[in-house]
Design a protein with these regions (language model features):
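Short metal-coordination and nucleic-acid-contact micro-motifs, chiefly zinc-binding Cys/His arrays
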Residues: 34, 131, 425, 429-435
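Bacterial N-terminal signal peptides
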Residues: 4-15
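Charged, amphipathic alpha-helical linkers/stalks
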Residues: 472-505
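Solvent-exposed helix-loop boundary motif
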Residues: 19-106, 110, 114-203, 212-256, ...
């Protein structure tokens, strides 16, 4: 009773005074009380939907309504609750407040609930959001110019220009000079000057001592794997099953056949006949080399009836350079290989061919696949026996740096390049769409967003070279074979001579750009005049650019500053939450990069990836090898082994192949032999109506699948037949000197360097597609392609019938045909054997003779090159 009377008396006689409304009451009595008795439940946890850490939060209230009504303590839920006058709300739970504390709260509410900002609150409300929105993109983990603005210590340390802050002195603080834009060179942020109010707030903060309270970050959300997620087939350990016995001897010699035959019997299907020897050799030669078997090779193979004749032919093809060119192209499809960067100006990457050739050579050497993967993820961190191997390992990291650069300023949009890297790593090496977890937990697969950013931190701790960008066209962070320091020493005198020209060129370019932004009224100055001056400067600097010594460089990855990354809310780099330790997907073990590790984590990633206990890499690549031989994988979605992907048609066979692949030293060539020597591979492609009724898609392989030649096979084969194909290995494309790259969004790089070599060596641009490759469903340097679609369009037919290339090649082949035979039947026989890889049937001879009575031999050859027997492999 005494307490209620005291409170009523206080409210009755409390008068509004200047002192009551001053901040002292809040700072001395109210804030400490709220922190001590209320914040445990009513800050981040927001019990009852109520926060009590700001005036706005109190006015907003929680589930029961506003906590206070300024000027009306008797109507305020907060006062009713702490005074225990509310019917249900009695606060705080630990016990009633002292009457004087209740009186202070009531007085404070009566006087308008004044809530002056503390230095901490001022920083959190007025300063930190500005830094996060305008500075952290460049001066967070990226530490542009050596400066980080993620803590007071980092700001005091500063970067290359010196300390960013001088607490108490806004005039001397580089940060303030930069945002006021009264510094000679520092003008920040790059996107435009901040508002006067924002600059004033920053200045006040610095003047008051630059108080920077430590803000505890949010916790990484807990992700609990469900039993059904853990039990999904692709995440299970690889176990090598015993091959089932077949009741037909020819289907009981090869484990591939035993598994296939068992499934055929289960489905009530009968295997078809074996392909004839000419068809079989043509099929295998295209499969392994991407080129047709010659008339002489086919004739010799048909005549050779020894039991090991086909195996010897396989060995010969696997030992040829053409094997690596064919199978290296498959891998280049997966990693979206290109010779340009992909930014708005599509800057060239002259060194990219080294990675391409590394891939081709790796297949030719039958490099173990696990080693192949380790070199591409962390080659620069692996031991090497000599300098040549060290350099080979470094070049291998082109897998990482081939990631696409995006936009006018790729450096500022680095996160998009990292997204491209992670997406390709997931699809290409694990068969998982990890990129779908960038903005939120994966909707179907057990991949939380934290897994995405655990990998993000690894690649964000890696240095990617820059090919140039519109406003800074000079390359950076290249890897020199002689080493960074030695290269700097060698290049210094050339850099010194070139520097004035670089500065002049940028000055002229900036002057030219000004005409886009504002009117220039200086007499005699116009956009055209300045452009002419700019092009002259660029012409004048060429001799200085070309004077540089040709130091060997690679488009390679290297170690950056190791750090963990924060989860980006909806994939927005400027809106981050919890910090995630670098590591690997939870469903595959969830191991973390050790805290003691001083590197990026790429080495640990490469080791985890290729651990035989990891079930995905071997399964994925075994399935892809099968796909390239049969036109369809055991898992039809060759880069998606997740919930939304296709289920395996032969799960036991897939596990057998994966286990066998690892047992055989991760060898591609041994896997080829296992598959090609099977009855399954050697089946004819002819239809069996009874089987088609049950299995129209041939999912269970009762026949071989007929496949169209891909874009490279078509052009390479035609050139080989005409005698114009250069079989030597390709090298660097004839790009201009890299110090003269002045490409921009509206004048991007374009080029199409014609070459007589195989198509795999052709220059592949990202923004401008090769019209021929695009027409015949060729590779896209912007997207991973483990499966190429096979379309049939009228434009393809028009190209085959009317293009200059086809006309010229047909004429060259005709010259060879006319020289090879003196009679019409002999020439027809030569044409069929050379172009179709078989002898003509009697009806085909008659049709050909009738055709030749009306049209010349060139038209005959041209029509054969445009026909299905040439364009398809049975």
């Amino acid at each position: 009773m005494r307490f209620v009377l005291l409170l009523a008396f206080a409210w009755l006689f409390c008068r509004v005074s200047a002192s009551a409304a001053e901040p002292e009451l809040f700072e001395s009595k109210i804030r400490p009380l709220l922190i001590a008795r209320c914040h445990a439940c009513h800050t981040d946890t927001a019990s009852g939907g109520l926060r009590l850490d700001s005036r706005a939060a109190l006015l907003k209230g929680g589930k029961s309504g506003p906590a206070i009504i300024a000027g009306k303590p008797d109507e305020s839920l907060l006062i009713q609750a702490v005074a225990h006058k509310h019917a249900t709300l009695k606060m705080p739970p630990a016990g009633q407040l002292d009457p004087q504390d209740v009186l202070n709260l009531a007085t404070w509410v009566k006087d308008g609930a004044v809530w002056p900002e503390s230095p901490r609150e001022f920083f959190l409300s007025k300063v930190k959001p500005v830094l996060d929105a305008n500075c952290m993109g460049c001066h967070g983990d990226a530490a542009r110019a050596g400066l980080k603005l993620d803590s007071r210590e980092s700001a005091l340390k500063g970067g290359k220009s010196g300390p960013a802050l001088v607490p108490g002195d806004p005039q001397k603080s580089l940060l303030m000079q930069a945002v006021r834009q009264d510094h000679d060179t520092l003008k920040m942020p790059p996107a435009g000057r901040l508002s006067d109010d924002t600059i004033a707030n920053l200045g006040q903060w610095v003047k008051d001592g630059a108080i920077w309270p430590e803000v505890k970050g949010p916790e990484v959300p807990v992700y609990n794997l469900r039993p059904d997620q853990k039990a999904f087939w692709s995440f299970q350990p690889i176990r090598k099953p015993a091959a089932p016995q077949a009741d037909r001897p020819e289907w009981n010699r090869n484990p591939v056949d035993q598994f296939i035959y068992a499934k055929l019997k289960e489905k009530g299907l009968t295997p078809g006949k074996k392909a004839d020897r000419a068809t079989l050799l043509r099929r295998a030669t295209f499969d392994l080399t991407g080129l047709p078997a010659t008339r002489e090779e086919i004739a010799a193979f048909v005549a050779d009836q020894s039991p090991d004749a086909f195996e010897r032919r396989i060995d010969k093809m696997l030992a040829s350079q053409q094997y690596g060119e064919r199978w290296g192209r498959h891998w280049l499809d997966v990693v979206r290989y290109a010779d340009t960067a992909g930014d708005s100006a599509d800057f060239p990457v002259p060194e990219m061919y080294k990675y391409r050739n590394y891939v081709i050579n790796s297949f030719n050497k039958d490099k173990p696949y696990d080693q192949f993967l380790r070199e591409q993820i962390a080659g620069d961190l692996l031991p090497a026996k000599d300098d040549n191997q060290r350099w080979e390992h470094i070049v291998a990291t082109g897998y990482i740096t081939v990631a696409r650069r995006v936009g006018v300023s790729p450096t500022s949009d680095r996160h998009v390049t990292l997204e491209d890297t992670i997406g390709n790593f997931g699809q290409g090496m694990l068969g998982l769409s990890i990129g779908c977890a960038r903005c939120h937990d994966h909707k179907f697969d057990p991949i939380p967003t934290a897994d995405y950013y655990a990998l993000y931190g690894i690649f964000d701790s890696t240095t990617y070279p820059a090919s140039g960008e519109e406003h800074n066209p000079y390359r950076r962070d290249m890897t020199y074979r002689v080493g960074k320091e030695k290269a700097a020493e060698i290049l210094k005198p050339f850099d010194d001579a070139f520097a004035p020209w670089k500065k002049l060129e940028r000055k002229k370019f900036d002057e030219y750009q000004e005409f886009q932004d504002k009117k220039i009224l200086t007499p005699g100055r116009s956009r055209e005049v300045v452009w002419k001056e700019l092009t002259q400067v660029r012409e004048d600097l060429k001799p200085f650019a070309e004077a540089y010594p040709p130091l060997e460089t690679a488009w390679a990855a290297s170690e950056g500053k190791p750090h963990d990354s924060k989860i980006q809310v909806y994939g927005e780099p400027k809106n981050t939450t919890a910090l995630v330790r670098r590591g690997f997907p939870l469903i595959l073990g969830g191991m973390k990069v050790p805290e003691s590790e001083t590197g990026s984590g790429r080495l640990e990633l490469s080791q985890w990836l290729t651990d035989p206990k990891n079930p995905l890499p071997a399964r994925v690549i075994a399935n892809r090898i099968w796909h390239y031989h049969f036109g369809k994988g055991i898992v039809a979605t060759t880069s998606d082994f997740g919930v939304r992907g296709a289920a395996p048609t032969h799960p036991e066979l897939l596990d057998y192949l994966a286990a066998r692949f690892v047992e055989d030293g991760w060898s591609f060539k041994k896997m080829h032999k296992l598959i090609l020597l099977s009855e399954t591979y050697q089946l004819a492609s002819m239809d069996i109506p009874a089987n088609s009724a049950t299995d129209p898609q041939n999912n269970y392989l009762w026949r071989q699948n007929r496949q169209r030649l891909d874009a490279e096979e078509i052009t390479d084969s035609i050139r080989l037949l005409s005698g114009t194909l250069d079989l030597s290995m390709g090298g660097r494309h004839p790009f201009p000197n890299d110090r003269t790259y002045f490409y921009r969004q509206h004048e991007p790089f374009t080029g199409n360097f014609e070459s007589p070599r195989r198509a795999v060596y052709g220059m592949q641009q990202r923004i401008v597609k090769n019209p021929y490759l695009d027409l015949f469903d060729g590779p896209d340097g912007n997207l991973p392609m483990s499966e190429r679609r096979s379309t049939t369009t009228s434009l393809q037919a028009l190209y085959l019938m009317n293009s200059e290339f086809m006309d010229h090649q047909s004429a060259l082949i005709t010259d060879k045909l006319l020289a090879a035979g003196k009679t019409t039947p002999a020439r027809i026989e030569w044409a069929y054997g050379t172009i179709f890889g078989r002898s003509p049937r009697p009806d085909e001879i008659a049709q050909s003779e009738a055709f030749l009575k009306k049209l010349p031999w060139t038209s005959f050859v041209h029509s054969m090159l445009s026909s299905n027997p040439f364009l398809f492999v049975d």
